[in-house]
């Protein structure tokens, strides 16, 4: 009966006038950390178009991902579910369970024209046990590339221009910037994007080495972000040209942090905190006022469905943050949970953010947390290895090689932005650690999470980043988390 009523509500919503519902453009960057945009305080990275959206919209300062890993993060966003609740999709390059709806499909069934342009990196599992396969969520799927631009954004404006004019639209615009190996930097067009970033001006995080090779690596990364920003500006200009900007909600975020050591795949803010910029002239009150409201990536799906007048699917574990568009600091959740599963290397870690603290539980503490293979192969990682071999690493820089790791980590986010001082053993914070550990235990139990005994093994060498297996050899794959508890059929959201 519940699913019948849900379907009936979708049919009713589809009959609504297009003018009553906002258009939506969801822009997702690839491997971009929250503090690498100008509007978040980075004075070196050039992001004028994103900065303008933030200045006239709503910038979220406490937005967190559920996974700092490409496809698990994207799968979580599109389903509104935690990675371990998406079936095998909790691990990199794995599909979402077939019975779980994607929110663009619900928008499409409710009358929206939907398109995905750029990087996809999400698949629906083959149906099993008599389940029907996932219906197509997009009217259009386009890789978004053209000669001289393989960044996924070359046809964003074309998609806007050629859309049906009698329907509201939802576009998932997925840039490949700023994923290694710096395609945008190699195909740089100064006439469009301006001069390349000067390595002397980049901000070097304390967990990297401050040398010429690392600075050049960061400058190339900044160039990727600036290229993305250019195409965001082209999208906004096309919306203005069409007279559609006023009632179009634009959201920009990233799938995970920068592909550098101690960022991408980390549960720390360098990996899990995302830039989150919204712009919607018709719907945002007090534009330009940033928000300190805590939100999670799983909140995107229920928010967009609510704004479109579409019933939120019962499978979705997130909560709508629509009230923040009216009241900048409206409280929509108290806690944000994240997880780290297999991404090139064997892994199982969990975290919760609450009360201004970050609590991390390392369930495989004997292994180092060096980052994904592309980061291990980077010039920045090579420079860390040089200092390691010379015995010259600072404690912050040595963190990527640390083994065993502490089983628990606790950080006070307001006083330790880079999260370098672990308070887990500090008696002054013992009660905080107990509370957050209990929250994580409750979330684990209620959402059906687990740590499998036959966990997926390393696919790459941890020192060199080179593959340990031949192509299409998946023998390293083990059991995903939550598999033994049938977590893909668990809809409980856990503490919020």
What are these model-predicted stretches?
Residues 413:
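Structural signature of FAD isoalloxazine-binding scaffolds in flavoprotein oxidoreductases
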Residues 70-71, 458-461:
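Acidic helix-start/capping segments at beta-turn-to-alpha-helix junctions
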Residues 445-448:
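Short arginine-rich
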Residues 13-14:
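N-terminal signal peptide c-region/cleavage motif recognized by signal peptidases
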Residues 450-459:
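Short, flexible loop/turn segments with low-complexity composition
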Residues 2, 6, 17-409, 417-442, ...:
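Formylglycine-dependent sulfatase
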């Amino acid at each position: 009966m519940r699913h019948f009523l849900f379907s009936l509500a979708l049919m009713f919503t589809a009959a609504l006038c297009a003018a009553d519902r906002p258009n939506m453009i969801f822009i997702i960057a690839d491997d971009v950390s929250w503090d690498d945009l100008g509007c978040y305080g980075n004075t070196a990275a050039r992001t004028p178009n994103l900065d303008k959206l933030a200045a006239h919209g709503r910038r979220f300062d406490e937005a967190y991902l559920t996974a700092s890993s490409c496809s698990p993060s994207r799968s979580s966003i599109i389903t509104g579910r935690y990675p371990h609740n998406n079936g095998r999709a909790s691990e990199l390059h794995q599909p979402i369970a077939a019975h779980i709806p994607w929110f663009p499909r619900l928008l499409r069934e409710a009358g929206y024209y939907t398109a995905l342009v750029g990087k996809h990196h999400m698949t629906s599992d083959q149906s099993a046990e008599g389940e029907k396969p996932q219906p197509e969520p997009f009217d259009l799927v386009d890789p978004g590339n053209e000669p001289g631009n393989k960044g996924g954004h070359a046809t964003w404006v074309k998609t806007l221009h050629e859309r049906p004019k009698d329907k509201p639209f939802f576009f998932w615009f997925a840039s490949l910037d700023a994923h290694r190996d710096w395609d945008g930097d190699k195909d740089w067009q100064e006439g469009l994007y301006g001069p390349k970033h000067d390595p002397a001006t980049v901000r070097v995080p304390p967990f990297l080495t401050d040398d010429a090779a690392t600075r050049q690596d960061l400058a190339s990364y900044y160039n990727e972000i600036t290229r993305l920003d250019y195409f965001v500006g082209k999208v906004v200009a096309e919306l203005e040209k069409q007279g559609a900007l006023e009632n179009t909600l634009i959201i920009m975020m990233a799938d995970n942090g920068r592909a550098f050591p101690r960022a991408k795949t980390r549960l720390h803010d360098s990996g899990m905190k995302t830039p989150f910029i919204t712009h919607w002239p018709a719907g945002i009150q007090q534009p330009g006022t940033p928000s300190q409201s805590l939100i999670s990536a799983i909140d995107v799906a229920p928010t967009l469905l609510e704004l479109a007048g579409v019933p939120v699917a019962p499978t979705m574990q997130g909560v709508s943050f629509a009230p923040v568009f009216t009241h900048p600091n409206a409280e929509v959740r108290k806690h944000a949970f994240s997880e780290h599963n297999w991404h090139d290397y064997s892994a199982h870690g969990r975290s919760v953010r609450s009360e201004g603290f970050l609590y991390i539980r390392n369930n495989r503490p004997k292994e180092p947390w060096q980052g994904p293979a592309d980061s291990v192969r980077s010039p920045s990682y090579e420079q860390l290895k040089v200092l390691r071999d010379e015995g010259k690493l600072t404690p912050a820089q040595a963190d990527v090689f640390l083994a065993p790791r502490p089983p628990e980590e606790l950080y006070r986010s307001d006083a330790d932005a880079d999260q370098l001082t672990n308070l887990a053993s500090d008696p002054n914070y013992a009660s905080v650690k107990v509370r957050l550990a209990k929250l994580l235990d409750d979330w684990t139990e209620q959402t059906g999470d687990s740590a499998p005994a036959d966990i997926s093994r390393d696919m790459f060498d941890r020192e060199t980043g080179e593959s340990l297996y031949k192509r299409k050899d998946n023998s390293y794959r083990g059991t995903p988390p939550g598999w033994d508890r049938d977590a893909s059929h668990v809809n409980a959201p856990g503490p919020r």
